[in-house]
Regions:
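Surface-exposed binding patches on compact interaction domains or structured appendages
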Residues: 1-26, 50-118
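Short glycine/proline/serine/threonine-rich loop/turn segments at secondary-structure transition edges
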Residues: 113, 126-134
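Short, hydrophobic beta-strand segments
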Residues: 118-127
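An acidic-aromatic substrate-binding cleft motif
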Residues: 145-165
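Contiguous beta-strand segments within globular domains
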Residues: 27-53
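Short solvent-exposed strand-capping/beta-turn motif centered on an Asx-Ser/Thr pair
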Residues: 47-52, 63, 127, 141-143
Length: 165
């Protein structure tokens, strides 16, 4: 499910996606599978279109609160993104700001920069086997939903073997 107003865009993406300001995220992902005991993450990319929105809030439903953490992804300076002799498979060749820092976020006081892609990073851990539908919503300061999206996670009743690294 995806519901949004015309001036706000939001959808789920892979945890591997680098959600960068002016680049539309490409790794759309609305469902995945994990094992019992595995830590799993996904992102919700969002942007406000044409207006700076402040004092936004979020709501996350679909899993026990003690098993889910929400972070905001913040950009940090990247002064040396490519070493000499590197291949051509790079996100940026010049110094820039890159999304990298995960900051714990309170459910309110969130800002959406006009035209800039940003992301929430959602981590689930310790979920029992079963099917989960995470419903993530962004709310305006009056508590009205301005965008909403779902992410389905299937937790298998098997456990990964211990790694000997």
């Amino acid at each position: 499910m995806l519901r949004q107003k015309y001036d706000f865009e939001m959808f789920p993406v892979s945890a591997l996606e680098k959600v960068r300001g002016n680049v539309r995220p490409q790794l759309f992902e609305a469902e995945n599978t994990a094992f019992v005991g595995e830590r799993f993450a996904f992102q919700v990319a969002y942007r406000s279109i044409g207006v700076l929105r402040s004092d936004l809030a979020y709501r996350l439903e679909g899993a026990p609160e003690e098993n889910v953490w929400v972070y905001l992804v913040r950009e940090v300076p990247c002064g040396y993104p490519v070493a000499e002799g590197s291949d051509d498979y790079v996100l940026e060749a010049a110094p820039c700001m890159m999304p990298d820092l995960l900051m714990p976020v309170s459910p309110s006081g969130i800002t959406a920069k006009s035209g800039m892609w940003q992301a929430f990073y959602i981590v689930a851990e310790g979920l029992p086997a079963g099917e989960y539908t995470f419903r993530f919503a962004v709310l305006d300061r009056e508590g009205r939903t301005i965008a909403e999206t779902d992410y389905r996670l299937r937790v298998l009743g098997k456990k990964l073997p211990d790694a000997d690294l």
